[in-house]
């Protein structure tokens, strides 16, 4: 009985497959991570490391996820905001307020976790796509390599030791602790790595002003413009290769750089290359 039942199962699947009625599981594409560039800064606002320090509960049982942003050159702690989760809808307003207050950095350096990045091509996420629209380079450190953001991690250890052991009684009280720590860290505490100076003595606001309205991308005349569909695909000749649903409705640029090889560009960011013969996309960082 078992063998007959199994044979019947195979026959049914063969029939469904023959008539294209059988949904096959698609293997999820994994993208190689080429690693982050070394950090070299000689003035403020070239690179801002950012991260979520590990979550914890305040005394009333509410979760707190501290979002932190520093300036690599001066070591200044630009923001430390306790949030109830790591959702983009909560993190993006913190970055927007910071950009409005002090301007834009050249680059933001993070790990590969939410909401900063995803497992898709170029780690595209709603947050880093917004950064690209603002002309900010997103540097993603190598997975499981926190030492590539080591300076920021050392600040986190001090933050944890001085503000969360034990945690405050409520999120509001915890935020007050964060603000006290930030003032001391920036204004009172000399740092050996910057010649025993304080971060606030070296840091200055950025000259790059946050634009309230983001201009659409403008590509050179030789670049072919394609709009990403709601399904995350774009047109290449008669084909519709998949790119990313994060970019749905956005205009990308296709630049032919070889025999049937095209660069895929979004604003000034090279997302990858596609071979028009195989439709295989090779990602970049």
Predicted feature residues:
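Basic, flexible linker segments flanking DNA-binding modules
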Residues: 1-49, 55, 114, 125-128, ...
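Short loop/turn motifs at secondary-structure junctions
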Residues: 6, 103-104
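Mobile genetic element proteins and their domesticated derivatives, centered on retroelements
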Residues: 12, 16, 51, 69, ...
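Short beta-strand or tight-loop elements
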Residues: 45-50, 65, 239, 248-250
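A short, conserved beta-strand element enriched in hydrophobic/aromatic residues
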Residues: 50-100, 106-115, 141-142, 265-267, ...
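Charged alpha-helix within mobile-element recombinases
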Residues: 120, 126-211, 253, 258
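C-terminal, beta-rich DNA-binding module of retroviral/retroelements integrases
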Residues: 186-285
